């Protein structure tokens, strides 16, 4: 019994130490996460009946989030003295995130770790998204395409002068191209991704779902 209590105490101390170490504003770089909207719909959104997945939206890569990162690992759910965003502030992100529901969760998990206020975090995320040119070639995808994830990386690199291959990574899930993740300095310039972030899609080929 005593050993059990000591183990619980040690775990509590470790969690407290972790929370204390994840201070708001203490990070090395950002990951700008861009979701292929149709893939998110196929994996999650359709089952929810999310309006983001309605036909005719024409959404391609939408903003998933702007995530503070360490060179190894990442902070999350940090303590901050900043207030949470209002409903109006989260709703205002719908144009770049595909819908309003995601914005508040992104603030809670990642935004609080940025050291910024909620309005400034959303402004920074929006600016990061604005600075990246989305490859226009994918806007016309009208049927499922099977291709290597590296083809999409190549398109981003061609559309964004200065973006190098070690500054972008693709993810996939259930055989679908899921996200493009681009690594940025705190000033939103391109930079090399940490080793734990470079996790390219391991599939030889994956499916790019058609634009809805």
Each predicted region: which residue ranges?
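Bacterial N-terminal signal peptides
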Residues: 5-12
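N-terminal module-boundary/linker segments of secreted carbohydrate-active enzymes
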Residues: 20-43
